[in-house]
């Protein structure tokens, strides 16, 4: 059985307060996107488009789960969960989340995230980024 070296841990995020006492926890979005899209480029070149999309989707899901566990938490009421998620996304500068429609009987929800960290301001492409 192999031991994984990079299984996610908040230890990899580190103590930003101690590590960046002068620069703090902010960096420009261009730097975040530079890393994201060059990583995607390398994954696609090595494993193909379909696999790169799957890796990005899976890592985004894991990041969302970890973010939610740490910064949103469980709530008894759905409306309280949404409010906490909206606040966390706004506080971290990730985006402005809105519930556009909600059907509590079928549990179908449409939400949008305006000014999102990943792609707001990108030119339109003929494919999903």
Language-model segments: residues:
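N-terminal accessory segment detector
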Residues: 1-128
């Amino acid at each position: 059985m192999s031991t994984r070296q990079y299984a996610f841990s908040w230890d990899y995020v580190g103590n930003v307060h101690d590590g960046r006492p002068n620069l703090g926890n902010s960096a420009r979005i261009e730097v975040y996107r530079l890393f994201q899209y060059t990583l995607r480029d390398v994954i696609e070149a090595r494993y193909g488009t379909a696999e790169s999309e799957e890796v990005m989707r899976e890592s985004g899901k894991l990041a969302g789960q970890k973010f939610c566990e740490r910064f949103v938490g469980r709530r008894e009421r759905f409306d309280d969960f949404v409010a906490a998620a909206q606040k966390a996304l706004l506080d971290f500068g990730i985006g402005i989340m809105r519930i556009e429609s909600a059907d509590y009987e079928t549990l179908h929800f449409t939400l949008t995230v305006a000014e999102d960290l990943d792609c707001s301001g990108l030119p339109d492409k003929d494919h999903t980024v």
